[in-house]
Amino acid sequence: MMSVDKSLEIVSSAQEEGSVLSTLSETLPFAIGVAASAVAVIALVLILQGSRALSSGLSFTLGWVLGVGVVCAAGVAFGLAVSDDPARWTQWLRTLLGALLLVAAIRKWRQRVPSGQEPTPPKWMSGLQDSAPGKAAVLGFLLGGINPKNLMLTLGAAATLGASGLSSSEVWITGIAYVVVASVTVLVPMGIY
C-alpha cells in the first residue's frame, strides 16, 4: 500500500514547473470557458434540424475544431518564437486579455434587451437549418476561433502553453488536448447524432 508521503510526492512532482499535468491544469479553465459556449450548441442544434444535417453538422464541427486549433497553434507558435522571457510577456498578455474580456462583458451588459421586451435572434441564426456545408464550416470556424470570447480564452491558453517550459512536442500534445476539451460541446452532440 502506498504511503501518504509517497502520494504527496507524486502529486507535487506533477505540479512542478514544466510538467504536462500542471500545464493541462492551467489551460483547463480556458478550455472550459470556450466549451461553455451556448451559441455553438444552439447553432449546431439548428443545423442538425435541417435537411443537410449530417454534412452541415460535420462541417460545422470541423470548422469549430479548426478555428480553435488554428488560433491555439498561432498563439503557441508566437509564444515559442518569443520565449526569451516568457513570464513577462505572458503576464502582460493575460492582463490585456482579461481587460478586454471585462470591456466586452460591460459592453454586452449595456446592450442587453430591456426587461419586458422580446429579444430577437441574431441575423446569422436565420437560415441555419438549411445551410450548406461550406457555410456551416465557416460559421463553425468563426464561432470557435474568431468569436471574441473564444479568441481571448484560446490566446490565454496559448500563452500558458508557450510559457510552460515544456518541450515542443509536449506543448503541441497539450495544445491538442486543449482543443479537444474546448470542442467537447460540439463533438459530443455531433457524435451522438
Where are the language model's segments positioned?
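Alpha-helical multi-pass membrane helix bundles of inner-membrane/thylakoid proteins
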Residues: 3-16, 104-148
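Structural signal for alpha-helical transmembrane segments and their membrane-water exit/capping regions
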Residues: 111, 192-193
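Membrane helix-loop-helix hairpins that form the core translocation module of multi-pass transporters
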Residues: 52-126
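Structural signal for alpha-helical transmembrane segments and their flanking helix-loop junctions
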Residues: 21-56, 122-191
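Membrane-interface helix termini and inter-helical loops of multi-pass transporters
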Residues: 16, 78-88, 160-170
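Juxtamembrane transmembrane-helix termini in multi-pass membrane transport proteins
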Residues: 9-85
